[in-house]
Amino acid sequence: MILRTLLISAVAPGGEEEEVEVAVAISPLKLMTAGLICGILGTAFAWVHPLIPALAVIPVVVWGADAVRRVAGYGLGTGVPSIGFMGLGGGSVAAILAAALSGNTVPAWAAAIIGTVIGAVVGALLGVLDRRVIKMKIPVMERCSTEIVASGTLALICLMAAVAGDFTWSAVYSKVIATGLIAVLWAICAISLLHPFNACLGPSETQERTLWLGAECGSLCTVVAGLATANPVVLLAGAAAWLITFWKFWELTKRDAADVVWTGIVPKGE
């Protein structure tokens, strides 16, 4: 795969910022564009079949996982879970507000856009607070925080639309919020954003392997939507997507690993 070089700022030992090169297989702009288009269109056509938004969540999760990768790469990985749940903390509020707006006057696609924009604004504010007030020396904090909350918002919107069968307030409230499924969807979205880089971080980490794991996590979101709705079509499609993406991730893991050995059953300690 052809690698492109992405220039980002880094913090030098003396505290000043300097430019470093990061090799990426797919540019962040392309991932964001794909995530936005798929997520918004998936929400807009949720009324046709819940499988559409259930599958559309996958590229949205991949986009968010890449944003987590870019910002969490500045540390040792200890803040990866925190930033994933932060993204869905702000994203859940924006997603519910988008659902409340959706109905007769505001179409689903417009509500999805409004919710994503609100999520982006929340993310930008969190990024500014993190960097300017808390003094976290992460130069890409503002942009990545914006993308993480925006992608988390849109991923949650897609799953809400998939479970509800449409992205209108009446459907979302009765089938997602009143039933308590909103908590399950919130958790699976947050874990899907944070887990890929958290599992792959280290000196041999590559964007390709991390994002394939992100696609695998997104496929599990589809499976959860199928289970929540007892819809066999969504469930089988999600399971098929999971098998494909997990197989690809496993192949890349074996490629990048120094060796793959069977150690046997761990012996019981005294």
Curated annotation (Swiss-Prot):
The answer to keyword Aminoacyl-tRNA synthetase applying to this record is no
Q: In which pathway does it act?
A: One-carbon metabolism; methanogenesis from CO(2); methyl-coenzyme M from 5,10-methylene-5,6,7,8-tetrahydromethanopterin: step 2/2
What does the UniProt keyword field contain? Cell membrane, Membrane, Methanogenesis, Methyltransferase, One-carbon metabolism, Transferase, Translocase, Transmembrane, Transmembrane helix
Quote the catalytic activity from the record: 5-methyl-5,6,7,8-tetrahydromethanopterin + coenzyme M + 2 Na(+)(in) = 5,6,7,8-tetrahydromethanopterin + methyl-coenzyme M + 2 Na(+)(out)
Q: Does the keyword Plastid apply?
A: no
Transmembrane intervals: 22-42, 45-65, 83-103, 109-129, 148-168, 177-197, 224-244
Q: Where in the cell is it found?
A: Cell membrane
- One annotated GO biological process: methylation
* Xref: Pfam families: MtrC
Mind naming one GO cellular-component term on file for this protein?
plasma membrane
Topology with regard to the membrane? Multi-pass membrane protein
The GO terms describing molecular function are: tetrahydromethanopterin S-methyltransferase activity
Which enzyme class?
translocase
EC number, UniProt record: 7.2.1.4
- UniProt family annotation: Belongs to the MtrC family.
Describe the task this protein carries out: Part of a complex that catalyzes the formation of methyl-coenzyme M and tetrahydromethanopterin from coenzyme M and methyl-tetrahydromethanopterin. This is an energy-conserving, sodium-ion translocating step.
- How is the quaternary structure described? The complex is composed of 8 subunits; MtrA, MtrB, MtrC, MtrD, MtrE, MtrF, MtrG and MtrH.
The protein depicted here goes by the name: Tetrahydromethanopterin S-methyltransferase subunit C
Q: Which organism is it from?
A: Methanopyrus kandleri (strain AV19 / DSM 6324 / JCM 9639 / NBRC 100938)
